[in-house]
Amino acid sequence: QYKEMFIVIRCKYQGKTYSRCAFIWVDKEFAIIRGQHQGYPKKLGSIQMSRPAYVGKGGPRLEVGSTFGATLGAWDRRLAEAKFTIAGDAESPGFVNAHPMLHHRWYPAIETNGQDSIEEIVTMSGYDVEIGRCFKGDFELAYFDSPVEELTSLAPKEIINGYWHEVGVSWKSGTTLARKTLPDF
């Protein structure tokens, strides 16, 4: 298991609506390699978040009025922080997971001639999706400037809603939508 923080945007490709992961940080190296194979632009980061407490007073409960927090750091810089307060149950976790993902798999060639080894546009959807408890609520989100990250370039313009949910998804393959023909050697 690992923690991740990601920014997903909606996009269209060849007339179809997709979700695209613009930024994603994970806290384990193995998650970076798998994600890059899938086309996610994963980077290593430090992610901290409140976990629900089911007994005792060691954290917030999954009930109206409880507040959860999360932070993202990378390269010894705070990049983002968030706070979510449960307002009530939700039927679903919004539209973030409602569309298939669209990714760009790109790897430069080992030569320094400007050629690429891989350049593809791919899509994928999970299977065996299981959604657990889901809550909607109020949230606050703040991004911070960094000399090496560009997260502030996608600052929110409109707040739609906040969600907290449990989800399990499996993945095994995707579909290549476009592949740039690479030069022969």
Spans of model-derived segments:
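Interaction-surface and assembly-scaffold signal
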Residues: Y40-F185
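Glycine-rich, compositionally biased intrinsically disordered regions
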Residues: Q1-Q36
